Every structure is written in C-alpha cells, then in structure tokens.
Amino acid sequence: AGRRRMQLIYYAIPFFLATIGLEWWLLGRSERKEGTRTELVGFTTKDSFASLAMGVGFLVVEIILALLPFAGLAWLYQFRLFDIPVVWWSWILLLFAEDLCYYWFHRLSHEVRILWAAHINHHSSTHYNLTTALRQSWTTPFTGFIFWAPLPLLGFPIEMIIIQKSISLLYQYWLHTELIGKLGRFGRVFNTPSHHRVHHGRNPIYLDRNHAGIFIIWDKLFGTFEPEGEAVDYGLTKNIHTYNPFRIAFHEWASMLRDAWNAKTWRGRAGYLFMRPGWTEDGAGKTAPALRHDYLLEKQA
C-alpha cells in the first residue's frame, strides 16, 4: 500500500512541474499584458524554491517513514467491524468517509498547537500558487495518521484507504492558484480555489475557515465555511520571513517547546501543547476565534 501511494505521487511529479510552469507563464503573460499587476500575488523565485524544497523533503520523509502509518492502520484493520468489499459502491462510500476524516484532521491541525506545529509550514508562504501546494509537512506522519483510524475499523481495506488518501492529496493540488475564480454551483458542494484561498488567508475573518479536502459541505455542516470576499492576505498572523526549509519545517516546534519549557505550571505546559495556537498561560494571547471576534466587533462599530 505504501509503495502504491508513492507510485501515484511519483507519477504526478511531471504534471506538477508542467502545470507550475504553465501557471508561471500565464501570470507573467498577464503582467506583461496589463502592465502593473496588483491584484495577484504571483511568484517569487526564493519563495517557490522554498516550497519545492519542502516538497522534496516531504517525499524523503514519505520514503523513510511510509510504513509507520500504514502499519498502524493495518494493525487496526484486524479489529474491523465489517468486511467491506472492493466494489464500486465502497469506493463512493470511502470517498466521503475519507474526506470527513481529512476534514477533522485538517481542522484540528489548526486548533491544537502540537498538530499546528506540523501543519504550519504549509501556510508559511505569503504567496499563493501551485508551488504552495507542494509546501508539505515533514512531521505529519508522526501526528496525523490516527485521524484515519475509523476507516480500517469500519472495514475498508488498507490499500483502498491509501489510494483514496492519495487521490484527495492530488485533488487539493489545483486548489492552490489565483488564476481560477469562483466556480458557481460546483463550489456549493466541492472545494475550489476560491474556497481554499480563504483558508490560506491571514485576514482575521478568514482564520481557521474552509478546512475541506474535496467536499466543502463539511465546512458548511460544521460551521467553518467562509466565502471569499475581501482580498486575501496570504501567510501567517506572524510571518516568519525565511526561505530556509529547515526553519520553515521546524520553527513552530521550537517555539512551542520553548513556551512549554518556560511555562510556570504543568497546566501551562499542557496548554502550550494542546490548546489553540495563540493561547498563553497568562491569558494575554489571541487565538484565531478571538482575533475574528475582535475584527467583527470593530467592523460593526
């Protein structure tokens, strides 16, 4: 199963490179045609190479550690409730079930700091293009696989799960572009570039919104949906201003562990690991809901 997942990703690499080149050309053509282009952030060389370096690191980690999450899921499969066959309807069922697992993984990766430490690098770019999609985490294999535990316990075969996880990852690639606008009725059900631009925004109104993988219906169902309105300011609430892939990958781990080490109480130490990003022991910190709340109050004033 692990080998099959890697094969799917490897086969997609030429497509990634070709579409990145096409997007770069289209953005450059737009800039040359319009003179000064201010509405799109576009590319910078250093940022794009940092994202590509993160993608290469992700592949290395996947090669080295691929068996860990798969072994865990395979172990859980022996306790399955049902024997789900590999037929057309089970693929449709898995499409929705896996996407729901992804939604909660992604949402909690924004709401629990130790999970955010693994995910933050994907949001660290102040640009939004197809290279941003490749700015993947090097540490998620240690923190993420447990969210897919319900699938083998229900009885989905491991190889089906791994293939569907790969399909979800590949679907999300095209979401990372400024070139595609809103998609009307399609966007009522499916995740789109417009929805995902919101997710990458550091605007207070956009923080921790639109966690969907394939289906945006989960955000609408669980109250985390926000349509694209004001211009998106990409990046983190506190940007890190570095193109060093190792700093991008591990800066939040270092910050989190430093905060926990310096905490005055065990409750504080636990809080710095498991509360929302922005939480502080003295209560002075601002989490995403607090920043959003303050913004809405200010807007209404």
Regions found by a protein language model. Give the residues of each.
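Short, Lys/Arg-enriched N-terminal segments with co-localized hydrophobic residues
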Residues: 1-5
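Hydrophobic transmembrane alpha-helical segments in integral membrane proteins
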Residues: 6-16
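Membrane-interface helix-loop junction between the first two transmembrane segments
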Residues: 22-49
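Cytosolic-facing loops and C-terminal tails of multi-pass membrane proteins
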Residues: 232-301
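Membrane-embedded catalytic scaffold of the fatty acid hydroxylase/desaturase
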Residues: 56-65, 84-235
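Residue-level signal for inorganic ion chemistry
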Residues: 23, 52, 218
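Alpha-helical transmembrane segments of multi-pass membrane proteins
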Residues: 18-29, 62, 66
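Membrane-interface helix termini and inter-helical loops of multi-pass transporters
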Residues: 73-83
